[in-house]
């Protein structure tokens, strides 16, 4: 009596799409690479500790960009460090995501006006998917940002990159934010 010999009943059948299965697998197993540069890195480390337990979300930190699918940029990115951030981003396999954590990586933080050596936001050198505000943000805020990344992954489709999808939306003059809201309402209605 093997698994193939068992009778299939209505309770054993699962109907879904390949997109949903792949997206579920990717969002249930995020492997972030933390790029801690300042005080935000301390909060990022606290999030990985036992009090918050990121492993319950399927999030396992990695130290190599070749093994990670999410880059968390936490802290002040200087002009000299920008080249290394780009290099690490390019070494990550597709699909890859970026979470910008804290005011310094979002917009330059307290150095935005007089800090000639500070990049005024990491989004000037690499594409950022989710911004987590704060100086430094609490671990709860980082967990909220990670859950937002999981929501983005849940809405992706096979064969269409995020860049292509956004270009198509721009050509049709459709607001992507409205589509996300419509998808959420549809998911809640069913």
UniProtKB/Swiss-Prot annotation:
One Pfam family here: Oxidored_q6
Source taxon at top rank: Bacteria
EC number: 7.1.1.-
Broad EC category: translocase
Localization per Swiss-Prot or TrEMBL: Cell inner membrane
Cofactor note: Binds 1 [4Fe-4S] cluster.
Binding residues for [4Fe-4S] cluster: 39-40, 104, 135
Keyword annotations from UniProtKB, A to Z: 4Fe-4S, Cell inner membrane, Cell membrane, Iron, Iron-sulfur, Membrane, Metal-binding, NAD, Quinone, Translocase, Transport
Protein topology in the membrane: Peripheral membrane protein
Catalyses which reaction(s): a quinone + NADH + 5 H(+)(in) = a quinol + NAD(+) + 4 H(+)(out)
GO CC annotation: plasma membrane; respiratory chain complex I
Protein role: NDH-1 shuttles electrons from NADH, via FMN and iron-sulfur (Fe-S) centers, to quinones in the respiratory chain. The immediate electron acceptor for the enzyme in this species is believed to be a menaquinone. Couples the redox reaction to proton translocation (for every two electrons transferred, four hydrogen ions are translocated across the cytoplasmic membrane), and thus conserves the redox energy in a proton gradient.
HAMAP family: NDH1_NuoB
Membership in a protein family: Belongs to the complex I 20 kDa subunit family.
Name this protein carries in UniProt: NADH-quinone oxidoreductase subunit B
Organism: Chlorobium phaeobacteroides (strain BS1)
């Amino acid at each position: 009596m093997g698994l193939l010999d068992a009778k299939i009943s209505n309770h054993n059948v699962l109907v879904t799409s390949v997109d949903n299965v792949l997206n579920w697998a990717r969002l249930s197993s995020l492997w972030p690479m933390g790029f801690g540069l300042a005080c935000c890195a301390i909060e990022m480390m606290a999030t990985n500790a036992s009090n918050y337990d990121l492993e319950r979300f399927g999030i396992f930190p990695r130290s190599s960009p070749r093994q990670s699918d999410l880059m968390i940029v936490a802290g002040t990115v200087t002009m000299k460090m920008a080249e290394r951030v780009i290099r690490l981003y390019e070494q990550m396999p597709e699909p890859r995501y970026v979470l910008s954590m804290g005011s310094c990586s979002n917009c330059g933080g307290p150095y935005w006006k007089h800090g000639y050596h500070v990049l005024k936001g990491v989004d000037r050198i690499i594409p950022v998917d989710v911004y987590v505000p704060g100086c430094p943000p609490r671990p709860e805020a980082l967990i909220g940002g990670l859950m937002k990344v999981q929501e983005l992954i849940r809405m992706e489709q096979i064969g269409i990159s995020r860049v292509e999808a956004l270009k198509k939306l721009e050509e049709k003059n459709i607001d992507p934010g409205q589509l996300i809201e419509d998808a959420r309402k549809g998911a809640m209605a069913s």
